Amino acid sequence: MGSLKKDGEIGDEFTEALLYVNGVRRVLPDGLAHMTLLEYLRDLGLTGTKLGCGEGGCGACTVMVSSYDRKSKTSVHYAVNACLAPLYSVEGMHVISIEGLGHRKLGLHPVQESLASSHGSQCGFCTPGFIMSMYSLLRSSKNSPSEEEIEECLAGNLCRCTGYRPIVDAFRVFAKSDDALYCGVSSLSLQDGSTICPSTGKPCSCGSKTTNEVASCNEDRFQSISYSDIDGAKYTDKELIFPPELLLRKLTPLKLRGNGGITWYRPVCLQNLLELKANYPDAKLLVGNTEVGIEMRLKRLQYQVLISVAQVPELNALNVNDNGIEVGSALRLSELLRLFRKIVKERPAHETSACKAFIEQLKWFAGTQIRNVACIGGNICTASPISDLNPLWMASRAEFRITNCNGDVRSIPAKDFFLGYRKVDMGSNEILLSVFLPWTRPLEYVKEFKQAHRRDDDIAIVNGGMRVFLEDKGQQLFVSDASIAYGGVAPLSLCARKTEEFLIGKNWNKDLLQDALKVIQSDVVIKEDAPGGMVEFRKSLTLSFFFKFFLWVSHNVNNANSAIETFPPSHMSAVQPVPRLSRIGKQDYETVKQGTSVGSSEVHLSARMQVTGEAEYTDDTPVPPNTLHAAFVLSKVPHARILSIDDSAAKSSSGFVGLFLAKDIPGDNMIGPIVPDEELFATDVVTCVGQVIGVVVADTHENAKTAAGKVDVRYEELPAILSIKEAINAKSFHPNTEKRLRKGDVELCFQSGQCDRVIEGEVQMGGQEHFYLEPNGSLVWTVDGGSEVHMISSTQAPQKHQKYVSHVLGLPMSKVVCKTKRIGGGFGGKETRSAFIAAAASVPSYLLNRPVKLILDRDVDMMITGHRHSFLGKYKVGFTNEGKILALDLEIYNNGGNSLDLSLSVLERAMFHSDNVYEIPHVRIVGNVCFTNFPSNTAFRGFGGPQGMLITENWIQRIAAELNKSPEEIKEMNFQVEGSVTHYCQTLQHCTLHQLWKELKVSCNFLKARREADEFNSHNRWKKRGVAMVPTKFGISFTTKFMNQAGALVHVYTDGTVLVTHGGVEMGQGLHTKVAQVAASAFNIPLSSVFVSETSTDKVPNASPTAASASSDMYGAAVLDACEQIIARMEPVASKHNFNTFTELVSACYFQRIDLSAHGFHIVPDLGFDWISGKGNAFRYYTYGAAFAEVEIDTLTGDFHTRAADIMLDLGYSLNPAIDVGQIEGAFVQGLGWVALEELKWGDAAHKWIKPGSLLTCGPGNYKIPSINDMPFNLNVSLLKGNPNTKAIHSSKAVGEPPFFLASSVFFAIKEAIKAARTEVGLTDWFPLESPATPERIRMACFDEFSAPFVNSDFYPNLSV
């Protein structure tokens, strides 16, 4: 521990370092400088704070930090990412985690209660982070926050389950901004329509006035609830105050140590800092650790001396004077944002143009948690070439004031500060003291620019800062001075100096614009092999940004000088910002109650545990004594022969216990869910980057990772296949995977002249990362002297874990038990690819007879566990001049990766769904699974169905283009009908497609929306809108017949409560809740009397994975079967007496020695498709749906937003409408990510700047799932009414996967908008658009004068497929 000596140096005398956690005083020992706040909290047992990514990108680790501001003499509260915050950075502060709010026993905090009641928690892994972000906003706000502030505070939190709408609704009530918030149409903005339901007493949307067996949820009928309904009346605990001890405590310097020789210093004055810098010139200075922490964790960089400058007053100084504003380099970005907002309100408008630009740029800079700790100086001195702020400092005439260890101060213009890649004009004996920003002058304008993959919390692709100072010379304006700065175009932020020089002295008119654009092309040169790729896109953005700047300046000066040459009004949309509107939504459904619970919108059974952080996940399980931690040794090349494995360096690593390889496996090394075609540990050859070679165990997780990194593997590299097309050319297919489907006679149809027209083409689509918030993990231990093995795993398929471990260890399955309580999201990614993780951990556990815990880091999880398959479809389609489809000839390929896994089944479902909802008389489909040198791809929501349907919808769009008709017209004339026979010989029954489509078309007012989009497009050159409607038909069942079985175990206890155990896994989809509702209604008891226990292989054996959307059908039916068995046994007793309660009946049966336990079983009937004959039912039934979407794109940048989405599904009589609506919304937003945001970038021929076979996008920093700002502005969900499904339990239908594909409506709406943009330049022919439609693809498809210098009109960006 350290204190400040009289001579100003930090000494080694002990002084107590401390912090408060949830009101409890904690003394911090020396030796923890390597530890993050998250690790510390979880070591304390406060596991409600989750590790989702470890890089501050997901928000699952959010906590609130309170500190005392000695300037204002007040305590301040702010949200931080605990995964990045060094433990010692919060010394002397108060940390409040989710456990510090409310809990089930003493009452929930209003924020927790609201989220739980609003169905805002599904898997629950992200939930504590969202709650802490909202709680921090409330604690830090003097007044009720606005709706915009609420959504802004959540920008740093990701959710993969809900689609965000219920979260926004839950928190919006705290704005208290509108009395009509939950009362229908608001005077301020449309809201969601939640009400207190008289049937349940909980928030829903039914609007019903009475409790009926059948009630209709209708957006036109609302019952008011107010803030007081969730104001915490049941919350008996008190808010934690800022500890008085910390108010009085003097701030002292610190010197603390940590593992690996790290020393942490905290100086509290500038002089002390300069002395430390003189002694340790290579020390890393930090405030928030948002950059250094990632470098140390992901890049494994080692820094021996860390100096926290957050508490140095001189670096936090503010000085506002007549010339400008000077801000200290340690000032946090959130403080800078508040400061600029205050200045804009107080200073004359002409002085604050730069301040306004910074405000706009900071809005989109990272998330709130990062802005709360990241500082100005860190962002500047890191000198990232894609820094959002540095180009603005450069353009704004800012000066950086630098001091050396002697106290000498110098100033340097920001535009001269950056010398090269992460190199600045500052010596090792210097630090950045402050930044001076001058006021802008009359006729001086500063503007910010940024284009990223995602608006919220994303790094820039290209950004910029631009300034012009105009001089009024009568009827003309001349450029007196100019700055044009870009980021993302070179190894450093740079000024386009030739362009600046060219502009000065010129008349500000359209001729200058055209000439300047030519100069920029030669001034800003991006090399063709530049890291980051997207070269043509980035080049075009440099011109687009300048054009936008020129328009913006011209618009601003036009009112003051009418002589300025004006642009047409249609151009001005180019400078209008993306609106940040409140997200709203409505839900419309009928409630058909069956018994006490089925049909009711019951809240997720675990919701209250999840909102309090009490719900346990695999990594939260208390570890047994003597537990070891494991980490993988992974291949670093895509295809190679292993020459040697040297673990000598690992053996000397701290905490190392052992390295286990294939030779150590006691059982069989070959594994696989269907075909055992992959090795658990590679022996002679590796076939992908990330293939497991062995597993290291050590005393801690970090030590295991460090030791694994020291294992030296030498290779002889071999040729690698890195795309589907490379596989096709090399005939590289997995054995026995060619599949064929046939209907009618395709060749005869094409040759006979029946087809008026024939089109041929290709459709490519990329893969998708599951991005479940909880990474994969297992805890394995031995029992009874090592003769049995038990495990807790994050998996959708405990039986597969049991089977893999049994197989690898050579044990009978009866001696292996796998348990799963809940998982933090799965989406198919934990169906099979999680099993090898448990198997790998079981080897050292079994051999050492010690518990072993293996939790994957986010980057490793994304790299090795597989993704949604990328696909290639080659089609030939014949049709009439009217648009009637006659024939489809389709070759379809998926990228299986280096093992088969489930790729064949995925391919088969894609082939089944390649008709989508269309009647096609003649069909021939041939499918193949490609072997490539990538990690094996696997199941993902939809399981190939979305890929097959997306291929179909692409050629449907092309038919429409060929015939100059709307796509909707082509769809409607080709819809399947009741009795239609598919190309796999299944007859459609209870087909509700037409009814559903018609109702949606009316409710979304599609024709009006299209007219309005056309009208908008005619008046706006650079913004375009598009609308689209898409249908879906999703088959329900496993396509492998034997998997359509389910078991359950039901116990009735003498107190009248019921315990249910079944083979399905709760992963947020509400399966346990629905199953409990089935049991409650069966016994006619309250839902609170039913408890669903963990999924365990020793309770229900041989369970199929929780997948295929069929779990509610199967396990609900199995539970009902068990309940009915018990009811039948109880009936003789019940018929003889009138019992007042179920408990009385149970007690009587017990005394009559009646068995109150039953095993239920369900077999899905009438299934079994024969691929040889091409006959048989592949599915039990279909879930039909349709969606409408309206989007707006910025043709100059490729940015887009979804203005509206309306979704309608036929779910029969829903078991739980609220849960089903949540599944629909979540699937839609996840699908939106697939078609428009999420792009996997691999090292392949298309991305040569990435190491071959390696995944670049292996974390939230580079891979962008939708954030709260990406959900549609208006998201409406309706369930078709009055259509019970006779083929599933209680007339319901499956919901998990069917809505996913409906997000393609956004994709095709984008394409319609692009079509409008291309029409502006005379490009009216059909054009391909690959998925995902990222900003790069959108912008480059909108060919214009700003992209023409770099590409032709038929240019399409590369895609990893």
Swiss-Prot record:
Boundaries of every 2Fe-2S ferredoxin-type domain copy: 15-101
Binding annotation for [2Fe-2S] cluster 1: C53, C58, C61, C83
Alphabetical list of InterPro entries matching this protein: 2Fe-2S-bd (IPR002888), 2Fe-2S-bd_dom_sf (IPR036884), 2Fe-2S_ferredoxin-like_sf (IPR036010), 2Fe-2S_ferredoxin-type (IPR001041), 2Fe2S_fd_BS (IPR006058), Ald_Oxase/Xan_DH_a/b (IPR000674), Ald_Oxase/Xan_DH_a/b_sf (IPR036856), Ald_Oxase/xanthine_DH-like (IPR016208)
Binding residue positions for [2Fe-2S] cluster 2: C123, C126, C159, C161
Pfam families per UniProt: Ald_Xan_dh_C, CO_deh_flav_C, FAD_binding_5, Fer2, Fer2_2, MoCoBD_1, MoCoBD_2
Cleavable signal peptide: none
Keywords: 2Fe-2S, FAD, Flavoprotein, Iron, Iron-sulfur, Metal-binding, Molybdenum, NAD, Oxidoreductase
Domain FAD-binding PCMH-type: from-to ranges: 257-442
Inducers of expression: By salt and drought stresses, and abscisic (ABA) treatment. Down-regulated by cold and freezing stresses.
Consequence of changing Y421A: Decreases activity 4-fold
EC number: 1.17.1.4
Tissue specificity: Expressed in roots, leaves, stems, flowers and siliques.
Enzyme class, spelled out: oxidoreductase
Cofactor notes: Binds 2 [2Fe-2S] clusters.
Reactions listed under catalytic activity: xanthine + NAD(+) + H2O = urate + NADH + H(+); hypoxanthine + NAD(+) + H2O = xanthine + NADH + H(+)
Single GO MF descriptor: 2 iron, 2 sulfur cluster binding
UniProt KW Oxidoreductase keyword: yes
Protein function: Key enzyme involved in purine catabolism. Catalyzes the oxidation of hypoxanthine to xanthine and the oxidation of xanthine to urate. Regulates the level of ureides and plays an important role during plant growth and development, senescence and response to stresses. Possesses NADH oxidase activity and may contribute to the generation of superoxide anions in planta.
Family, similarity comment: Belongs to the xanthine dehydrogenase family.
Complex and partners: Homodimer.
Protein name: Xanthine dehydrogenase 1
Organism from which the protein derives: Arabidopsis thaliana (Mouse-ear cress)
Gene that specifies this protein: XDH1
